Every structure is written in structure tokens, then in C-alpha cells.
From Swiss-Prot:
<dbReference type="GO" id="GO:0032543">
    <property type="term" value="P:mitochondrial translation"/>
</dbReference>
<keyword id="KW-0687">Ribonucleoprotein</keyword>
<feature type="region of interest" description="Disordered">
    <location>
        <begin position="1"/>
        <end position="22"/>
    </location>
</feature>
<keyword id="KW-0689">Ribosomal protein</keyword>
<dbReference type="InterPro" id="IPR005880">
    <property type="entry name" value="Ribosomal_uL2_bac/org-type"/>
</dbReference>
<comment type="similarity">
    <text>Belongs to the universal ribosomal protein uL2 family.</text>
</comment>
<dbReference type="Pfam" id="PF03947">
    <property type="entry name" value="Ribosomal_L2_C"/>
</dbReference>
<dbReference type="InterPro" id="IPR012340">
    <property type="entry name" value="NA-bd_OB-fold"/>
</dbReference>
<feature type="region of interest" description="Disordered">
    <location>
        <begin position="225"/>
        <end position="254"/>
    </location>
</feature>
<comment type="subunit">
    <text>Part of the 50S ribosomal subunit.</text>
</comment>
<dbReference type="InterPro" id="IPR014726">
    <property type="entry name" value="Ribosomal_uL2_dom3"/>
</dbReference>
<keyword id="KW-0150">Chloroplast</keyword>
<dbReference type="GO" id="GO:0019843">
    <property type="term" value="F:rRNA binding"/>
</dbReference>
<dbReference type="GO" id="GO:0016740">
    <property type="term" value="F:transferase activity"/>
</dbReference>
<keyword id="KW-0934">Plastid</keyword>
<dbReference type="InterPro" id="IPR008991">
    <property type="entry name" value="Translation_prot_SH3-like_sf"/>
</dbReference>
<dbReference type="InterPro" id="IPR014722">
    <property type="entry name" value="Rib_uL2_dom2"/>
</dbReference>
Length: 274
């Protein structure tokens, strides 16, 4: 991804940095509308998720996370922008006439061929079971449950690593640093997700943030005591507590929120790093 830096000709473009324009011309049979009503509110109209609202209308692109078109070669026809994720998507034309969207692997260009199945070449963009991959392979779009489709390492620039295979399980190191076990029969896609420079983007102004459906975030220390536990005081006062808390009084910044009795607790060999 090429980052385009704006000149400081106007306040709205000062310090702005966006990626190069990637057009989006989705196929009608691969998109459908979304019903965004409330934006962070429940059925009674009460805010349940803060900092959401507004935003441009979007059409959802149907992404093939399962990659269940086995042993049929497909060709990358377009690389498109997707407003629902940071990663780009590719339109694939398969040999049997079917057309599907997949996540854009890093380095893939228009005209490349991909395939999914067992014993397929270890090539960027190909999807195959973990049992057929050599150790050290960089992968993304990893299944947790066989046949459910990829659920791990799908964000822009995400990549996991296959570090061991023993018995019926494979050991993966995920982008978060977590090391966990997954069935060797689960599938994954070879390579890294594209658009790795997305973290270098700078929106440059508040209006661009509003287009994404994100409302302003206000610090609790500048609120009144009735609105936040950190609020109140004369001038720039400290929070008045030993440790920071959420707006509802629960400990924040460091407290573990994962449930202790999850089914996957025995599958995680090393928890993700902060």
C-alpha cells in the first residue's frame, strides 16, 4: 500500500496521510445492504456501546472465509477496497464459472492464480489443511472449528506462524503473541494479509473519523462527578483514586476480563502479551 501525504495547504489536510486510491466496484450478487439503526443503542434507545454513531452507508461484501471450492483454480481479477474492514479484498474467477471475494494476500497481484484443497502447492493465497503445511509457514484466515471458516488472523497485515505439529493438534503463534493449539485438520491460507501499512494512516481531521461511524471520545477527568468517577475537582485535578476505573466504577487498564472457565482454556499454551 502506498501512503499519500498531503501538503499543509489547509487545516483539514494538515498532517493527513491516506493510502493510495483503490477503487471499489462490487458485484451485485456478492453484496447486500446492512441495517444500521441506533448505532450503539439497544431496543429502548439507551446507549450500550459508547462512541458510535453516524458514518457513511455501507454495503456488505460476502467474503469467502471457508475457501471450500476444492481443487479448482481461480484467477485474481480485481483488488478492491472494502469499507467493512482494513484489509483489501480480491475478486476471484474460478474455472467452473463461480465468482467469490477473498481477503487480499500480501504481494498478490491481478492475474495470479490460487487454489484450495489438500496437497496443493505452498504458495501465497492457497488454502490447505494445517497437516499439509511445513513448520514455519506464515498463514492467515485460520479456522478454529473444522468447516466453519477462517476466524483468526484476518485483519490488515495479520500473520500467524505454524510452529509445531503433534498428534491431532497443531501449535500456532498468533499475531497477538498467544500460542494455542488447533486441530491439524483445520484449514488456513498461506501468506500474510495485505495492506500492511494501514497503521501509518493519519486521518488528519475529526470529520474523517465521523465518516467511519466513530463519535468523539471524552476523557473522564474533564467530566463532572455525576458523569464519571474521575470527574470533578478544581482546575486540572487528578482522578482522586489509586487506580483508574471505568465510567461504571470497575477497575480499568490491566484488569483481566477473560472468563476463567472457557472451553479453550486448555488449548492456550501462552496467553497473549499486553
Amino acid at each position: 500500500m502506498a501512503i499519500h501525504l498531503y501538503k499543509t495547504s489547509t487545516p483539514s489536510t494538515r498532517n493527513g496521510a491516506v493510502d493510495s486510491q483503490v477503487k471499489s466496484n462490487p458485484r451485485n450478487n456478492l453484496i447486500y445492504g446492512q441495517h444500521h439503526c441506533g448505532k450503539g443503542r439497544n431496543a429502548r434507545g439507551i446507549i450500550t456501546v459508547r462512541h458510535r454513531g453516524g458514518g457513511h452507508k455501507r454495503l456488505y461484501r460476502k467474503i469467502d472465509f471457508r475457501r471450500n471450492t476444492k481443487d479448482i483454480y481461480g484467477r485474481i481479477v480485481t483488488i478492491e477496497y472494502d469499507p467493512n474492514r482494513n484489509a483489501y479484498i480480491c475478486l476471484i474467477h474460478y474455472g467452473d464459472g463461480e465468482k467469490r471475494y477473498i481477503l487480499h494476500p500480501r504481494g498478490a497481484i491481478i492475474g495470479d492464480t490460487i487454489v484450495s484443497g489438500t496437497e496443493v502447492p505452498i504458495k501465497m493465497g492457497n488454502a490447505l489443511p494445517l497437516t499439509d503445511m511445513p513448520l514455519g509457514t506464515a498463514i492467515h484466515n485460520i479456522e478454529i472449528t473444522l468447516g466453519k471458516g477462517g476466524q483468526l488472523a484476518r485483519a490488515a497485515g495479520a500473520v500467524a506462524k505454524l510452529i509445531a505439529k503433534e498428534g491431532k493438534s497443531a501449535t500456532l503463534k498468533l499475531p497477538s503473541g498467544e500460542v494455542r493449539l488447533i486441530s491439524k485438520n483445520c484449514s488456513a491460507t498461506v501468506g500474510q494479509v495485505g495492506n500492511v501499512g494501514v497503521n501509518q494512516k493519519s486521518l488528519g481531521r475529526a470529520g474523517s473519523k465521523c465518516w467511519l461511524g466513530k463519535r468523539p471520545v471524552v476523557r473522564g477527568v474533564v467530566m463532572n462527578p455525576v458523569d464519571h468517577p474521575h470527574g470533578g475537582g478544581e482546575g486540572r485535578a487528578p482522578i482522586g483514586r489509586k487506580k483508574p476505573v471505568t465510567p461504571w466504577g470497575y477497575p480499568a487498564l490491566g484488569r483481566r476480563t477473560r472468563k476463567r472457565k472457557k472451553y479453550s482454556e486448555t488449548l492456550i499454551l501462552r496467553r497473549r502479551s499486553k
